[in-house]
């Protein structure tokens, strides 16, 4: 039995398909979804979504958002979604270093600090993908 997955951004449905197991980055850590999962609503963080179908593994880098889980599906509403295959590790490393340098000179609780922290989180997710 499979789990139907939808990853939706403000611009479009970035991915739709079925898998045996989906893992998503929750606020309290990664959570997995198998068929017959309990109904759940969760806040998600920037990170890596992993979809497993048999021996095939597909990964996406996603921004923060929400997950709605049902017995046979998961819908992720996120602000961005990129295929892990499209990630340029050198660019992600540069973005992470720039974000960390910027964080040293700003109030991390300010709006600017939170924006920079989000950039750092996305760069880290790209490097993990």
In which residue ranges do the predicted regions lie?
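Compact, glycine-rich, soluble single-domain proteins
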Residues: 6-97
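N-terminal export/targeting signal detector
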Residues: 1-4
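Acidic/glycine-rich phosphate/pyrophosphate-binding loops and surrounding catalytic core
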Residues: 81-129
